[in-house]
């Protein structure tokens, strides 16, 4: 297996994508947040003391995705063309599933 982010001496480098063709790319990441039934009820009803938890989390997720190239070493700066953050409340397992989908058209992708 060849590691593309290292040169022949093992030094880290940013991959050169200048010769690649632009393509449309899309990726979705999902994760689950587990909590007590009482907490889940408050989040669902919007009665948490801090306000709209999922609304704030959505905005924070969008902001974080826009800063990916600053947070992940050697990641190319991406021109995101669409970004969604969605939540699914699953009361039977006391969880909230978070899903973030990012789209771009470029020489490198969001995957």
What is each model feature region?
Residues 1-54, 59-76, 82-111:
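C-terminal binding/interaction regions
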């Amino acid at each position: 297996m060849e590691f593309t982010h290292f040169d022949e001496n093992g030094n880290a480098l940013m991959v050169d994508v200048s010769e690649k063709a632009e393509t449309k790319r899309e990726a979705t990441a999902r994760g689950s947040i587990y909590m007590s039934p009482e907490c889940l009820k408050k989040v669902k009803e919007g009665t948490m003391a801090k306000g709209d938890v999922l609304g704030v989390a959505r905005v924070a997720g969008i902001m974080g995705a826009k800063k990916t190239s600053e947070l992940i070493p050697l990641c190319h700066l991406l021109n995101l063309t669409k970004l969604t953050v969605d939540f699914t409340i699953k009361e039977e397992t006391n969880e909230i599933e978070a899903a973030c989908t990012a789209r771009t058209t470029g020489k490198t992708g969001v995957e």
